[in-house]
Amino acid sequence: MSEDTPLVVAMDGPSGTGKSSVSRRLATRLGARYLDTGAMYRVATLRVLRAGVELTDPAAIAAAVKELPLTIGTDPSREVIELDGEDVSAEIRGDAVTKAVSAVSAVPEVRDLLVAAQRDIAADARRIVVEGRDIGTVVLPAADAKIYLTASAEARAERRNQQNIREGRGDDYAAVLADVQRRDTLDSTRAVSPLRPAADAVLVDTSELTMDEVIDELSRVVAQQISTGSAQ
């Protein structure tokens, strides 16, 4: 597949499957841009938290993000995530945002705002890997390739706990597992854009695969979907 050929890859799945890491590497291999839509929801959540808005007040949440000065880069080799010109790439990964992001993401006005932005970014990129939770079903249903990454809750919790340890946030596997299960329930049962694979997505279980094995499998899946036109 030539790097001159337009390409949109939709990468969906729950948290902890390695979506961000593998999507960046896949984008690099494909000569494509990369968009982390989850980071956009995290920036919106940070905005809400800084405004002191109650997470039980959808109208106030919508008002807080109506004017969202968000900058997000699409170069897979470097992360650029800014809120009103401030680098918030580390802060949006903190516990406060992680615990609140599902509630903010469930507000229809928030999703409408960010989905429109995501579509604009994808349209401006000739080749792009877009990762999130509703890319193949809602954001880019006509994507050239659709992949749904999955892994057991235990495997995902172990990965996140190891990341927390590496980044100095402590070792608490039980708490991380409980949070993974909580977010799975919230994301799969929300009224707006519930987490589910697109009907034409290829499911890839990363539980027992190394990073290199995942990238190889995803490259194969993308090539196969492009050749057969199955993700349409």
Curated annotation (Swiss-Prot):
List of residues binding ATP: 13-21
Cystine residue pairs: none
EC number from the UniProt entry: 2.7.4.25
Superkingdom classification of source: Bacteria
GO biological process: nucleobase-containing small molecule interconversion; pyrimidine nucleotide metabolic process
Enzyme class: transferase
Entry's transmembrane regions: none
Chain positions covered by the region annotation Disordered: 1-21
PANTHER family: CYTIDYLATE KINASE (PTHR21299:SF2), CYTIDYLATE KINASE/PANTOATE-BETA-ALANINE LIGASE (PTHR21299)
Record-stated family: Belongs to the cytidylate kinase family. Type 1 subfamily.
Protein name per UniProt: Cytidylate kinase
Organism whose genome encodes this protein: Nocardia farcinica (strain IFM 10152)
Lineage: Bacteria, Bacillati, Actinomycetota, Actinomycetes, Mycobacteriales
